[in-house]
A protein has these predicted regions:
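An alpha-helical support segment within catalytic cores of ATP-dependent transferases
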Residues: 1-23, 33, 140-143
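Pre-DFG segment of protein kinase catalytic domains
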Residues: 20, 38-41
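Conserved protein kinase catalytic/activation segment
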Residues: 29-39
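Active-site activation/catalytic loop segments of kinase-like enzymes and analogous catalytic loops
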Residues: 50-81, 92-110, 125
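Alpha-helical transmembrane segments of integral membrane proteins
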Residues: 86-92
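ATP/Mg2+ or Mg2+-diphosphate-binding catalytic cores
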Residues: 101-144
Length: 144
């Protein structure tokens, strides 16, 4: 996976301080009781790059580019190209990571779910982004 290594190297060029993260913020892990918003499911929580948390969430929610910019601005105070690029690259890493997780689950889980199909879907989505015209721009923006 040389492209994954390139992403890691680009992200490590200017690393961000890690912050407490849930690392699994998909829609099902939010509960809104009308008075308060609850975040649940902390089995993967720990300190991480905040752009992974944001990128993973944007990927899971299938946010548009404008929504991704809004999330970036809400967290960092501005939709900075370098931070958006980090989020976009972490959206790829989210799909790669969850795709690998699903491939493992396909072999070991007793749950009646098509984990293998889900793994293929996630990998395909990651590959599509790595093959996109925007990928090289994100890699450059991360370093700037």
């Amino acid at each position: 996976m040389p492209t994954i290594q390139r992403i890691e190297q680009a992200m490590n060029f200017k690393p961000l301080a890690t912050v407490p993260c849930n690392n699994d913020l998909l829609a099902e892990n939010y509960i809104d009781d009308g008075r308060q918003l609850w975040l649940i499911d902390y089995e993967y929580s720990g300190n991480n790059d905040p752009t992974f948390e944001l990128g993973n969430t944007c990927q899971e929610m299938q946010f548009s580019n404008s929504q991704i910019s809004e999330v970036c601005a809400a967290y960092f105070g501005d939709a900075l190209p370098g931070m958006i690029a980090r989020m976009k690259l972490n959206m790829i890493m989210s799909d790669v990571g969850w795709g690998l997780w699903a491939a493992i689950q396909a072999k070991i889980s007793t749950i009646d779910f098509d984990f293998w199909g889900w793994a293929i879907e996630r990998w395909g989505r990651a590959q599509e982004k790595m093959d996109s015209a925007e990928f090289s721009k994100w890699m450059k923006d991360v370093a700037s």
